[in-house]
Design a protein with these regions (language model features):
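Bacterial N-terminal signal peptides
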Residues: 14-23
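N-terminal hydrophobic or amphipathic helices and topogenic motifs
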Residues: 27-108, 292-329
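Bilobed "Venus flytrap"/periplasmic-binding protein-like clamshell domains
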Residues: 68-91, 126, 149-217, 224-226, ...
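Acidic, polar ligand-binding/catalytic clefts
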Residues: 111-169
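Ligand-binding "clamshell"
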Residues: 131-143, 237-251
């Protein structure tokens, strides 16, 4: 398989966050205001689909220690060292201590920001709208190239020795989706494949593997007949030697989707937000472990949720997704 490349602490704090009674947060629900699909904790008076900064300046957060977490798509332990050059840069620019937390689930990550214990986060594509609507996350950056290109594709793989040559051949097969909220691993296939003549759950059996890497390794081991996965994930897996590209066959690839969004909490002090954005947009990937891990990425590029996540919201709407804590798994 050959496709173009693109792109420390214990979990005790985030675990505690996920257990924080939501009743405490509900007590701070905003008075009647325009909020669109946002949770009652937030307002959206300007209609940009993300939470407004609180009008009361006393509610602005200006922590001396910033907590940063990256999406739990793959083995989280790997990323503590990979992200360290950026964490150091973020600390230098903001003048704050910055701590990287490895998270085990999308739900824990969203709950951590919702409760105010997580200040900056990379949320994967599908969970980003949950983070925006449930946790007041404000997406502002993506990884991209110098010419502004960014994103990843949905790729459908099967084992090289299987009898599956096209999507049509998936009928009657056992196909691994990743998780219910994953874009490329579940929602996009459910929205896009029926137009191509194959409907998940009707034409093939869906089983959830739990992650993109487990889906891919399951295809290699022939535990699954096929799997839809994110191109950027399998490319990084191949680069680390986690599977042999010659063991799989690519039978479908979609157009590009936005990749992991980088967000700050809606209630951060505007001066701090300015420094956070400066840190992201001045970080040099060249010669760092982060640059090596995300091959083809050269910088962070500015984005806005309303525009760049429109295709994802459309896919989720087609799947009747509701942005509730119960649906975030």
């Amino acid at each position: 398989m050959k496709t173009p490349s693109w792109p420390k602490r214990p979990l005790a704090l985030l675990t505690a966050v996920s257990l924080l009674p939501m009743a405490l947060l509900a007590s701070h629900a905003q008075a009647d205001c325009e909020r669109g699909a946002l949770d009652a904790l937030y307002c959206d008076e300007n209609g940009d689909m993300v939470a407004d900064r609180p009008a009361d300046e006393s509610s602005w957060a200006n922590p001396s220690t910033l907590i940063f977490a990256y999406t739990p798509v793959e083995d989280p332990a790997i990323y503590s060292d990979i992200w360290q050059p950026f964490v150091d840069h973020l600390s230098e620019v903001t003048g704050r201590d910055v701590r990287f937390f490895a998270v085990q689930s999308n739900a824990a990550q969203v709950e951590a920001m919702r409760s105010g214990r997580l200040h900056i986060a990379g949320f994967s594509t599908g969970p980003t709208p949950f983070a925006v609507n449930l946790a007041g996350a404000v997406p502002f950056a993506l990884m991209g190239s110098d010419d502004g290109q960014f994103g990843y594709t949905l790729q459908m793989f099967t084992h090289v020795d299987s009898d599956i040559e096209s999507l049509e051949d998936l009928k009657g097969k056992r196909v691994a989706h990743t998780s219910p909220t994953s874009n490329s691993g579940n929602l996009a296939p459910r929205a896009l494949l029926p137009e191509l003549g194959i409907t998940p759950d009707e034409d093939y059996e869906v089983v959830y593997s739990g992650s993109h890497d487990q889906s891919m390794l399951g295809v290699v081991a022939r535990d699954y007949d096929a799997a839809p996965v994110a191109s950027e994930v399998v490319e990084r897996m191949a680069a680390r030697g986690l599977y042999d590209e010659e063991d799989v066959r690519l039978i479908y690839e979609s157009d590009r989707f936005p990749t992991t969004s980088y967000n700050y909490a809606h209630n951060l002090h505007p001066d701090l937000v300015e420094k956070i954005e400066e840190a992201f947009f001045t970080f040099d990937f060249v010669g760092t472990e982060l640059g090596e891990e995300f091959e083809g990425v050269e910088k962070f590029i500015p984005i806005n949720y309303q525009e760049h996540w429109q295709v994802i919201r459309t896919i989720q709407a087609a799947n009747d997704v509701r942005y509730t804590r119960e649906n975030l798994e």
